[in-house]
Amino acid sequence: QFRPQPQPSYSGNTSPIPIIRYSNEISPDGSYAWSYETGNGIAADESGALENPGQKDLEAMRAQGSFSYTAPDGSPISVRYVADRDGFHPEGAHLPTPPPIPPAIQRALDFIASQPQQPGNNGGGQFPRPQPFPRPGAF
């Protein structure tokens, strides 16, 4: 049976938010820079350019920028980032970080890293060649 769903209601300021500052520049070489700031405290900027132009397999766009705003709970949010051939790399005080490595594990990792490479233990393919399966009844 069909029942109309309640429509969400939005409260708050419905008046337009002014753009205080806006810039957008594109260069003939493909590099760019843009930025803006709004009347309610949102700000963002980014610049980018082609890295290693003309070098096959190394050519990639690289962008760096930031954005900031105030979260609904009133806390300031600010993110700086780089986006390149290795992915998106954000930094911000509010972003989660991995827990520290426990000292015992760190000592073990340091010990392993300090050991010389052992012959045949470097991933160089020192494995026995696979053998064919015997035919059924040929035992």
UniProtKB/Swiss-Prot annotation:
Coiled-coil boundaries: none
Any GO CC annotation of this UniProt entry: chitin-based extracellular matrix
Modified sites of kind Pyrrolidone carboxylic acid: Q1
Region Disordered, residue ranges: 111-139
Glycosylated residues in this chain: T14, S15, T97
One Gene Ontology term of the molecular function aspect: structural constituent of chitin-based larval cuticle
Domain of life: Eukaryota
Short name of any one Pfam family annotated for the protein: Chitin_bind_4
Residue spans of biased composition, Pro residues class: 129-139
Alphabetic keyword roster: Cuticle, Glycoprotein, Pyrrolidone carboxylic acid
Cross-referenced PROSITE patterns: CHIT_BIND_RR_1, CHIT_BIND_RR_2
Function statement: Component of the abdominal endocuticle.
Name this protein carries in UniProt: Endocuticle structural glycoprotein SgAbd-8
